[in-house]
């Protein structure tokens, strides 16, 4: 049923979140300041383009929609990007060490899914690439290919991991066809 599928996905997401947190907390990752700043600048530009309309400023948009200053939002975005970049670095290295390779058909399906799930924001793959490349298709495609490999590495680790939750219970097996809920 759909409820079982949703529950299975929620459990899998909880496992992935726990694994990502564990890996970040137990790894030493150096992010070059210039790289973090470049990613932050790209994020701010993209956020502004997507959200700030009709002559409104980022400052006014953040204040009216989030009750935050630009500095507060920038600090929060920087924290989130730091974890995201650490995840990309860690699982990118795992993909390399585990010899996880690009499957072009699966990658194209991944991009097609992004197009179909975009609620009309994208109508073709080139628009997705351009969006994720901050206007540069080739950079966006490279970024998405890296993300795809990172996600495959996360899936590989999740399949092999023995995840337990705060209450000490093991995560249910989400690889089988059903998920049991109590």
What kind of region is each of these model predictions?
Residues 1-182:
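Extended, charged alpha-helical "arm"/coiled-coil substrate-binding scaffolds
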